[in-house]
Design a protein with these regions (language model features):
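N-terminal strand-loop-strand beta-hairpin
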Residues: 1-128, 160, 164-195
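Short, well-ordered alpha-helical microsegments
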Residues: 16, 151-152
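A short beta-strand motif that forms part of the nucleic acid-binding face
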Residues: 71, 137, 148
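A contiguous pocket-lining binding segment that forms or flanks enzyme active sites
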Residues: 131-138
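A hydrophobic, small-residue-rich beta->alpha segment in the mid-to-C-terminal subdomain
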Residues: 149, 155-163
Length: 195
């Protein structure tokens, strides 16, 4: 099991090809190739995890299952910082059955294609920093994860300002996406899903 504190932001990506060129020009290296991820968030019937701003997620990617718990985010207007614990799971279907027996239900499912990059030469104090490109049914986003100073520098180098920072979850972004289009939000899934 891995436990850590994560600090991250999302940035909107209006032009996927342009942002890929920019990432290459900034000397990032691809550490995890583009892959499909299927994510399921769990909660109790009374939505106590959502109410307390915690997340319990089961992810399937590259034929592996990963269970993640995220604690409530610290108070910050610019960054989302929270404790994160995660562990690989041998059998995600069996874990799903266990979670249901404990009273947890599927609260939200979402798909994305994800590509993970790291700085070729990390700046001092930014070891482990990551730039992630997520392609979702509700739009494309960059996630910058690392120290706040690294996030700010990297966002600026990519052409973004602090006003562009997003700390909302994919569930919240999808609700907003649906509401703006007069649709009832459900799960955020591609019409054709693939591993």
């Amino acid at each position: 099991m891995r436990q850590s504190s994560e600090t991250e932001i999302k940035l909107p990506v209006p032009d996927l090809a342009a942002v890929r060129r920019k990432i290459r020009s900034l000397d990032f290296i691809k550490v995890v190739p583009r892959h499909f991820e299927s994510n399921t968030l769990y909660d109790f019937r009374d939505l106590r995890l959502r109410t307390s701003r915690c997340v319990l997620r089961l992810r399937r990617a590259n034929r592996q299952w990963l269970l993640t718990f995220k604690g409530p985010p610290a108070a910050s207007l610019l960054y989302k910082s929270r404790v994160e614990m995660e562990t690989l799971v041998a059998d995600g279907e069996q874990l799903h059955a266990i979670l249901e027996e404990l009273g947890l239900k599927k609260a939200f499912r979402y798909d994305k294609y994800r590509t993970v990059f790291a700085p070729r030469l990390p700046a001092r104090g930014a070891c482990g920093a990551l730039l992630v490109l997520d392609e979702t049914p509700a739009g494309n986003y960059l996630e910058l994860e690392g120290p706040e100073a690294w996030i700010d520098r990297t966002a600026e180098r990519l052409g973004y300002r602090r006003e562009d920072y997003i700390t909302a979850s994919y569930a919240a972004l999808y609700r907003n996406h649906c509401e703006a289009r007069g649709k009832v939000p459900a799960d955020m899934l591609f019409k054709t899903r693939g591993d």
